[in-house]
Regions:
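Short glycine-rich anion-binding loops that position phosphate/pyrophosphate groups of nucleotides
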Residues: 2-4, 73-77, 127, 152-154
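Beta-strand/loop-alpha-helix module characteristic of Rossmann-like adenine-cofactor folds
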Residues: 107-169
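Short glycine-cluster motifs
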Residues: 63-122
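Conserved helicase motor
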Residues: 45-52, 125-127
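Glycine-rich, flexible N-terminal cofactor/catalytic loop recognition
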Residues: 1-48
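Short active-site oxyanion
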Residues: 16-22, 94-97, 145-146
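Alpha-helix capping/helix-boundary segments
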Residues: 28-30, 75-76, 105, 154
Length: 169
């Protein structure tokens, strides 16, 4: 889901109910989603910096012939999310990874932006400190629409920085 527990596909719910282990960023967030949809499965939290021993646990489950689902706190695993490290290591060990598409914040915002999105740039999350001004300089100098993710708590700060870098825009 992309911030609303109802933004989830029937297929995603089926996968979650049929898998043997659910890998998540934060068990508290995953438990809320699973509770809402009456799903009870073992959870393994792998936060921002994936610990090798936790990824080894995922590989052990896969080696035993079981199925693992990867979730994220909001959005799509691997898109500006720590899930990419898990996926990379699972693929490197020869396991097949299948995407389960669903709602996307990126697609949602582009659909209502009111600008030509034939071509655009996605930047992920801006750095918190070092490199922040450089990140936003690239944003204001872009000739195509730029989309990036950000916490609602930093939006005003971002707008102030953008205004100082490109007051004419």
């Amino acid at each position: 889901p992309i911030g609303n527990m109802e933004d989830i596909t029937v297929r995603a719910l089926r996968i979650l109910s049929e898998c043997d282990l659910i890998v998540c960023e934060d068990t508290r967030v995953a438990k809320k989603l699973l509770f809402k949809h009456n799903i009870s499965k073992p959870l393994l939290a792998i936060p921002q910096r994936a610990a090798d021993e936790k990824i080894r646990r995922v590989l052990e489950v896969l080696e035993a012939g079981k199925n693992v689902a990867l979730t994220t706190d909001a959005g799509t695993p691997g898109v500006s999310d720590p899930g990419n490290e898990v996926v990379e290591k699972v693929i490197a060990e020869g396991f097949r990874v299948s995407p389960v598409p669903g709602p996307s914040a990126l697609g949602a915002i582009l659909s209502v932006a009111g600008v030509n999105t034939q071509e655009f740039c996605f930047k992920g999350f801006p750095p918190h400190k070092k490199g922040r001004e450089t990140f936003f300089r690239v944003v204001v100098e872009s000739t195509v629409p730029v989309v990036y993710y950000e916490s609602p708590y930093r939006v005003v700060k971002n707008l102030e920085l953008l205004a100082s870098l490109a007051p004419e825009k």
